[in-house]
Amino acid sequence: MGKTWEWDGLVDQAAQELRQLYFRERIQVSRKTVWREVPHLIQVSRRSAVDKQWFRGLGLKRQFVVRGAAASRDARKAVLLGEFAAAQWGMWFVAPKDHDVQFALPSGHLPPKNALPVSTKFKAFKTPPADTAELDGVRVTHPLRTYVDFCRMQKVVNARLAIGWLLRHGFTADEISDYADSFAGSIHPRRRRLAAILPYQVPHLETFPYMLAHSLLDDSRVNVRTHCELDRMGFATLLAGNDLVILIDEDPHWRALEAEPDGLRLAHNRRKRERWEAARGFRKLYFTAAEIEGAPNSFVSEVI
């Protein structure tokens, strides 16, 4: 991609459609709104509300898209940061415990506390035009800058996930590292080194659940390898230690496969391979993506 980054092709269609739907459906509110008279609405920013049932059915990450877009329209110059910027792009991330919308001003100055919009936090990070983009009028840091900000904020798991997403979208480890190394903003030397080195330590995994599992285990110093051949017959996307295969959203009996055309024999062979691997000492742990994302510490402790 060179030095001139093209961001339009990276916009996630689902996030874009949700953002545009919010702008069509939003209802303007004010301090004078009498909420008991509109019990079907929920406030998503100082000046905006949406249908309560619809919003609560979105799930936390999609709520981040709506809340970030709403808060951005209320804040005239502010730029979304961190997980709230990642949500607008459809990047891979895990939601933080603090759900306040994260912002920065282009100057890097912090606004007076009495001027802060509700449920927002500002970082003293400069956000020059070269580090930002607009998605349907919502000001966000671009994906490379979002990755560096995760490193600045010591959110290493989300930094790893951002790398995985960038690799999947055609960036190289060299491009990510070079951007971090030449980043002009203020950043602690150790975190700059981390941002420059980390792209070479993150494997290329095609899906968010496996990338999340690898990031959590690697961050916990668990010896985990990817794309491993098991004694010439089996295969593991993730192998912890020497014998523990991590499987996510997989059916151990391959029942769904049997319903497909010509799937009966293939399902039989998959089950036979499972038994072959078990007979040679390979253990398997099955998780769903929702289990890992909902209880990451529990996932790591079960593997350890």
Regions found by a protein language model. Name each.
Residues 1-187:
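Short gly/ser-rich loop at a beta-strand->alpha-helix junction or flexible surface loop bordering the NTP-binding
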Residues 9-13, 20-26, 167-304:
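Surface segments flanking catalytic/ligand-binding clefts of nucleic-acid enzymes
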